[in-house]
């Protein structure tokens, strides 16, 4: 903090510890010396200068006598051992330095090593002496602090230190009387100067010393109430005369000052308002009533409790504000329908008459509901009981009874019944649940594959149409949820599941076939319903054989309950009737870029359908697919060539980058395209080289886990799987130009065969 320019520099007060000599000086002389030294150490330069100008002049003849020099030497010698002066002998100012008048003496300060005492005559020019001292300090490099005192004060100090010597000369009484008489005048002047200085300090704006003398003891008992909050509560004299007498506190009420009463502000307001006959009260009267009946709010509580009272008055609808005709005075009342007429006397009453000895400690007891309830059980005759209000905390809490079985807001997924061994292969809800492996020679019924990430589908061996539509697929992608059509607008068709690879690029009905070694074992499916190849959608499985492996694309035509495709623990497919072909996975799979040469047998839907014409060129609508050039037909991403119309991330079909996805997909139109069955018997089985087999032989475990994460229902026709982000961006531009709404002649016949199965 910057000091005021008018405020003089005040040195810090230091108490001088001066050892006493053997001889005791006179009391007047000692007091005179102490006053002089305190004045020397404390008063600033300019204050001393003004004081010295008012002092009586000293004759120059007395100052220029050689005895004066000797007296100065004697003063320095006497102060040196007594006041522990530093090695700064008293110096007489040289005459050749301009600005110093005659008679000026300089000596070292008794306690401050970097300061010197300057004794000047009373009539000398203080300003010229200060300038001369400043020039001398710059030239000689000595102490830069000078304390200017008058010669009269020095004589008093000299007399104080020479007191023992005067006593030895038997002149103690006369010298002390003269010294005491001479001290009266400078002492009075110093007191006046000090008083003037204190007045200047008190007048300063930066002075905060008065804060140390502040205390709250002088404040009155009602000083807290002296707040300007009567803006709307100024009661005129006539209204005060008509005001009913208010109820006074019960003398038996225990006045507790230390703790807060166990009542809410809402209850306190009701106590106050209901205490008057007219059941109305001004805001100021409410404050006064609460303070009179509960001293805690008067002496202990912070003033913010009044804000809480105003807040509760405005918050609750039961408190109504009424105004007089002149709108000068407003009262607070309680709504008649909400008024319970709750008063303090009703809440607190004596349980039994008590002796005065028992009554005295009860006055100090805090009226707490919890303490009263606990004490009422054990000592109901000795303690007062609180008539319970509604509980303070729970009075505004409405109990809500929740049912034991909470309502199901979303359709829950029915869990699949797995065997005891299938718990090892269970993954998360987004993973395919794969049954553990078992030997192919087991006579047990084969375990089947189930899904939790798609629609609930029963075991493939026991597929029923009424079980296909029980549950929706829970998708993890928001894009899937946005693309899903409403339930009432989509025909739900479910495709069978498989544990085949989910590499992100291939999901065709493809199998490994040994065409050269065992041409009779070429995996074919018959167009009739008696012998379908009910192999599930992802069919890149390894066929056990002795010769080289080839990749063949074979699609399933009809999925019936008579000839199910059974899937065992060791990932083996059994065709239970005409073609008992065993498919195993004995080797590991690899993840490599797929190599495709030609279309093989296109895929078909798992729903019952009829074979269509074979003269059409589109692989989606024809029974046979035309072979194409492997170079021109290559694409980095393939889509299925059957009824799985969605560009799966792991499909190996062709795709078109020309249009938007699903533009030509008449999902809400004729379902004939969905029910066109392709007969794979007439399509040639084309071979691929064995590198494709090595790609399928080593497959990572992640692909097996995500193997059937794609939907096997028609919902996936409108859903893009976004597990592979880079692939999903490519699939956004895929269009199915081969799907058109032609050939709608068989729709009625197909649906007439399909829909009765749900009954």
Swiss-Prot record:
Protein's name according to its UniProt entry: Forkhead box protein M1
Domain of life according to the entry: Eukaryota
Function: Transcription factor regulating the expression of cell cycle genes essential for DNA replication and mitosis. Plays a role in the control of cell proliferation. Also plays a role in DNA break repair, participating in the DNA damage checkpoint response. Promotes transcription of PHB2.
Organism (species): Xenopus laevis (African clawed frog)
GO biological process: DNA repair; G2/M transition of mitotic cell cycle; regulation of cell population proliferation; regulation of transcription by RNA polymerase II
Gene: foxm1
Disordered, as annotated region: 1-92, 420-450, 516-535, 596-631
Protein keywords: Activator, Cell cycle, DNA damage, DNA repair, DNA-binding, Nucleus, Transcription, Transcription regulation
Biased composition (Basic and acidic residues): 48-63
InterPro entries recorded: FH_FOXM1 (IPR047516), Fork_head_dom (IPR001766), FOXM1 (IPR042839), TF_fork_head_CS_1 (IPR018122), TF_fork_head_CS_2 (IPR030456), WH-like_DNA-bd_sf (IPR036388), WH_DNA-bd_sf (IPR036390)
Keyword DNA-binding: yes
Localization annotation: Nucleus
Tissue expression per record: Localized to the animal hemisphere of early cleavage stage embryos. During neurulation, expressed in the neural folds. Later, expressed in the spinal cord and in the eye field. During tailbud stages, expression is still restricted to the neuroectoderm, predominantly to the hindbrain, the eye and the spinal cord. With ongoing development, expression is also found at lower levels in the branchial arches. At stage 35, expressed in the rhombencephalon and in the eye retina.
Residue spans binding DNA: 260-358
